[in-house]
Amino acid sequence: MLFPDDFSTWEQTFQELMQEEKPGAKWSLHLDKNIVPDGAALGWRQHQQTVLGRFQCSRCCRSWTSAQVMILCHMYPDTLKSQGQARMRIFGQKCQKCFGCQFETPKFSTEIIKRILNNLVNYILQRYYGHRKIALTSNASLGEKVTLDGPHDTRNCEACSLNSHGRCALAHKVKPPRSPSPLPKSSSPSKSCPPPPQTRNTDFGNKTFQDFGNRTFQGCREPPQREIEPPLFLFLSIAAFALFSLFTR
């Protein structure tokens, strides 16, 4: 892993990449901790990218990996002389566990550094020389086996802490979950069946007669009419027998 403090390696790699694609072009690359996002001076252009980097807290020695390390570049060309200058700022991050700690400087692998500079050279060649984009290696093939979950930690990001310029441009925004769509209403009226009648027991002497509530009705048909209950039927039978005896005398 290499520190941005070893910037001579960055400058050398940048010059080599420029000479491969644009021989004779003279561009310089310098670190500048004063440039800010969306704050390029008149005539300068801005280029931003996020890459994979590793941090270590200088207070508690805790280390963490982030895929949201922001790299900012401001460029000024002199196309008549085929030369220009680029200024780069590498933003740090704070430890999530320590209160009031400083922004730590990230470390990068050699492959990541080359990718950062490839992206910068690509932008310069396309913007100022009309070159086609050079195919780059994806992050997945750089040999970095790390698990990266969760949104961008804006509270501990140096780029996001610049109040005059707001959050860094490449901070991930979490989309709110979509509410489920309401179920469609049916146009035809629903037919509800009447609740089944409750079971009732009625005692007459030593016999128990169960009400018709225990009968099962199919579908929504109306229940059958109730039959004459035994006490009324017995009374009518006695009255008919008495009248018959009266007329036969």
UniProtKB/Swiss-Prot annotation:
Residues in 3CxxC-type zinc fingers: 50-162
UniProt keyword annotation of Transmembrane present: yes
UniProt topology in membrane: Single-pass type III membrane protein
UniProt region (Disordered), positions on chain: 173-208
UniProt keyword annotations, A-Z: Cytoplasm, Membrane, Metal-binding, Transmembrane, Transmembrane helix, Zinc, Zinc-finger
Major subcellular location class: membrane
Inducing factors: By interferons. Upon rabies lyssavirus infection.
Tissue-wise expression: Expressed at low levels in olfactory neurons. Upon viral infection, highly expressed in brain and different cells of nervous tissue.
A molecular function (GO) term: zinc ion binding
Record carries keyword Isomerase: no
Impact reported for residue 95 to S: Complete loss of rabies lyssavirus viral genomic RNA binding
One GO term describing the cellular component: membrane
Annotated TM spans: 228-248
Biased composition (Polar residues): 199-208
Localization terms from the record: Membrane; Cytoplasm
Domain of life of the native organism: Eukaryota
Topology, Cytoplasmic side: 1-227
Subunit structure comment from the entry: Interacts with TASR16. Interacts with OPRD1 and OPRM1; the interaction promotes cell surface localization of the OPDR1-OPRM1 heterodimer.
PANTHER family found in the cross-reference section: RECEPTOR TRANSPORTING PROTEIN, RECEPTOR-TRANSPORTING PROTEIN 4
Functional note: Chaperone protein that facilitates the trafficking and functional cell surface expression of some G-protein coupled receptors (GPCRs). Promotes functional expression of the bitter taste receptor TAS2R16. Also promotes functional expression of the opioid receptor heterodimer OPRD1-OPRM1. In addition, acts as a potent IFN-inducible suppressor of pathogens including lyssavirus rabies, influenza A or yellow fever virus. Mechanistically, associates with the viral replicase, binds viral RNA, and thereby suppresses viral genome amplification that replicates at the endoplasmic reticulum.
Family: Belongs to the TMEM7 family.
Name under which the protein is recorded: Receptor-transporting protein 4
Organism: Mus musculus
